[in-house]
Amino acid sequence: MSNKTLLIITDGIGHNSSNKNNAFYTAKKPTYDYLFENVPYSLIHTYGEYVGLPDMQMGNSEVGHMTIGSGRVLYQDLVKIHLAIKNDTLKDNEVLKNTISKSNNIHLLGLASDGGVHSHINHIIAMAKIAKNMGKKVFIHIITDGRDVAPNCAKTYINQILEICDEDIKIATISGRYYAMDRDNRWDRVKKAYDSITFANPKTQDDILSYIETSYKNEIFDEFIEPTSFEGYNGIEKNDGIIFCNFRSDRMREISSVFAKADFNEFDTFKGSLNFASMTQYDKNVFIPVLFPKDNPKNTLAEVISNAGLSQLHTAETEKYAHVTFFFNGGVEEPVLNESRVLIPSPQVATYDLKPEMSAPEVGSAVRTAMNNNIDFIVVNFANGDMVGHTGVFEAAVKAVEAVDFELGQIFELAKKQNYNIILTSDHGNCEMMKDDEGNILTNHTVGDVYCFVYSPKVKEVKTGSLNNIAPTVLKLMNLEIPKEMDEPLI
């Protein structure tokens, strides 16, 4: 019996007992249909306390891949920061105090929603109050969400921030996350957000609520709000402090590097000295003091396989590449010994509903090449269900599922010939619930379970569990010892 194992993560494809507004159900998916009839599977948890998040908090790709790759429940940053605010210890954080005290003015940049995937509005509000109490002027640079929450609810969150605004706390700029939180090297987008924050360019005469209302009338919703600054804000000045409030790293790497990377050269930047701090480490190659350093787990799945002298391949397209590498490996950037990586570029389109197959064919091809080369362990992420699900376009999400299903069919056929075990699961759901009961478009992740198929002659039954049970399941299939840090397998 072969020990070679393939772990497939179909991002954003979850279980929904209702067929209504369910792109996964609607899609023509012969591979999944075959699996449901012939391969053992169970439903596993991806959210809340099962993955180290607050109770009933939706899961996300960072947390999901960290949990899958480490094989245990990790206390997530959202929970750590919530507790620091609740216990009134955030104000005592040395990095935060030092950054505020040595800066002239404080600029807070963060995603202003309670989605809890990249940030939380309460963190921004708490830091604004702390900086004000330390005698500083505070400028808040709002990034609107529309993706991890409803597409047009920004005013709800902005009103919460307006409640704390006074002579010392001001909303300075606004930008949709499409611009400020790009992660695909679309520097033209990032520049628009950067210019509004740094140079107060452009500037609108509207107040923030009127600006949003005008955007809505023009069919521009929260994710895509055009960056602008507001009256009374004139830009960043020498010796100001910038605090990046998002705790998730992947969508803060670009915008933070523009400010903090000495040799950044994609476009013209502010030349004066500035002070920086970030909630977590975004990029080890760009020095920014960190409020909440990560505790990297030991004996991750990648490490155990490497220590056994076996080969492994991690592959995904750009949008999810960090997840199968950095996050999957427990927050470690460098590959382990005998780990190879294949990055497939994501298509250069404005939004992925325009190309719902994304780069799935190329990703699938990379997997099949690795299988033909008899790589001992392969992990792959298919991004379509999540990235197209986030657009809210139902028909495109259906096509996204169909594109993934086609690639799965080819992979499973080859698995039979090459004697691979396969675990097929997801990090969280999305496209299986595209509207709520009132008919409102949903673009966020779902709070629910996902499928976990285990295709192997060794397996007749799959237990229920959570994402933390995946890594030990891989190791059991590969006939490797499960380290004491990991939880129980599903088989």
Curated annotation (Swiss-Prot):
Family matches, as PANTHER family: 2,3-BISPHOSPHOGLYCERATE-INDEPENDENT PHOSPHOGLYCERATE MUTASE
Active site residues according to the UniProt entry: 61 (phosphoserine intermediate)
Binding site for Mn(2+) 2: 11, 61, 427-428
Record's keyword annotation contains Ion transport: no
Protein's name in the database: 2,3-bisphosphoglycerate-independent phosphoglycerate mutase
Organism superkingdom: Bacteria
Residues engaged in binding Mn(2+) 1: 386, 390, 445
Coiled coil: none
Gene Ontology terms: cellular component: cytosol
Described function: Catalyzes the interconversion of 2-phosphoglycerate and 3-phosphoglycerate.
Gene Ontology MF terms in the entry: manganese ion binding; phosphoglycerate mutase activity
Alphabetical GO biological process terms: glucose catabolic process; glycolytic process
Cofactor: Mn(2+)
Intrachain disulfide bonds: none
Membership in a protein family: Belongs to the BPG-independent phosphoglycerate mutase family.
Assembly: Monomer.
Chain residues that bind substrate: 118, 147-148, 177, 183, 248-251, 320
Pathway listed: Carbohydrate degradation; glycolysis; pyruvate from D-glyceraldehyde 3-phosphate: step 3/5
Cofactor note (record): Binds 2 manganese ions per subunit.
